[in-house]
């Protein structure tokens, strides 16, 4: 299965080497190809019109979001094209660290009342995704090249970002709402970790449930992005499911490691050196 999947990826992604921005006619073909994405903005116009008629006040935000997405994807396309043609592993590391940094900042913003939340989220995401990626490379599921590692890492980082942010946010909320229970446990001699075990478990269950539910229903409700991309790229459905199974496995692994680690890193900030709840953390709105 691993050999056939690697061959499939190689066959589908070999077109990358055939794209050269310096080649004659490249920019004309690129601009012609962008006509379809531009035409697709018609559905955004429909959404903006509906927002206006319903007085939602989201017109400006919708237009800004789509313009930003258009610009970001256009830029990242050229950046990835450059990286994919490089042989140095340094480019892989640089791109990966950039994704982790942005993801850590975003997850930390969700849990902004957790002290050092951005750093905790970044470290958790880095650990969860790097361990998972190392296992995949060691098992020869993916070769260590930019065109394989960067897209796969992007999927893992994005998923781990969401799960980690939810875990940290829910943990702080639950500890704050059940402060009396936690303080009683501390008074009876429990350690901070023991006193918050129930809240930790609840936050992890809430954060990981969407990942688990997605794995349960994959292919039944909607075709996942990786599988859809492969099929649209010319692969057979049987070939596409091989990669999608790997994707679901790696998302589950990376998300679980990242979310669990984030609880170990953020809960000490909830307590003082005297093993009392830190009022400053839970007094924030």
UniProtKB/Swiss-Prot annotation:
**One GO CC term, this protein:** plasma membrane
The phenotype of cells or organisms lacking this gene is:
No visible phenotype under normal growth condition, but strong inhibition of root elongation when grown in the presence of Al.
Keywords for the protein's UniProt record, in alphabetical order: Membrane, Transmembrane, Transmembrane helix
Q: In which tissues is it expressed?
A: Expressed in roots.
Keyword Ion transport on this protein?
no
The processes (GO biological process) annotated in the record are: response to aluminum ion; UDP-glucose transmembrane transport
Regions that span the bilayer = 30-50, 64-84, 88-108, 119-139, 148-168, 203-225, 240-262
Instruction: Please report the record's description of how this protein sits within the membrane.
Output: Multi-pass membrane protein
Q: Which residues form the signal peptide?
A: none
Source species, domain of life: Eukaryota
Pfam family membership, one: UPF0014
- Quaternary structure? Interacts with STAR2.
Q: Per the similarity annotation, which family is this? A: Belongs to the UPF0014 family.
What's the protein name?
UPF0014 membrane protein STAR2
Q: What is the lineage of its organism?
A: Eukaryota, Viridiplantae, Streptophyta, Embryophyta, Tracheophyta
**What gene name is given for the protein in this entry?**
STAR2
């Amino acid at each position: 299965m691993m050999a056939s999947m690697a061959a499939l990826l190689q066959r589908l992604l070999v077109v990358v080497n055939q794209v050269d921005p310096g080649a004659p006619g490249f920019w004309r073909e690129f601009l012609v190809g962008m006509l379809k994405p531009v035409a697709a903005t018609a559905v955004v116009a429909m959404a903006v019109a509906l927002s206006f008629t319903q007085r939602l006040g989201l017109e400006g935000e919708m237009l800004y979001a789509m313009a930003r997405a258009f610009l970001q994807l256009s830029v990242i396309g050229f950046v990835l094209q450059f990286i994919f043609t490089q042989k140095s592993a340094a480019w892989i590391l640089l791109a990966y660290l950039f994704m982790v940094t942005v993801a850590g900042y975003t997850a930390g913003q969700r849990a902004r009342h957790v002290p050092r939340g951005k750093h905790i989220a970044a470290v958790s995401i880095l650990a969860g995704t790097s361990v998972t990626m190392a296992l995949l490379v060691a098992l020869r599921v993916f070769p260590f090249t930019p065109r394989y590692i960067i897209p796969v890492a992007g999927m893992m980082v994005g998923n781990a970002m969401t799960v980690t942010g939810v875990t940290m946010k829910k943990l702080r909320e639950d500890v704050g709402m059940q402060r009396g229970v936690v303080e009683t446990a501390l008074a009876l001699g429990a350690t901070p970790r023991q006193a918050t075990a129930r809240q930790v478990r609840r936050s992890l269950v809430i954060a990981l449930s969407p990942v688990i539910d997605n794995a349960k229903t994959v292919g039944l409700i909607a075709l996942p992005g990786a599988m859809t991309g492969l099929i649209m790229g010319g692969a057979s459905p049987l070939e596409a499911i091989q990669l999608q199974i790997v994707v679901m496995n790696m998302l589950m692994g990376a998300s679980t490691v990242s979310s669990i680690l984030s609880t170990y890193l953020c809960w000490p900030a909830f307590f003082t050196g005297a093993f009392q709840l830190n009022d400053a953390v839970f007094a924030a709105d």
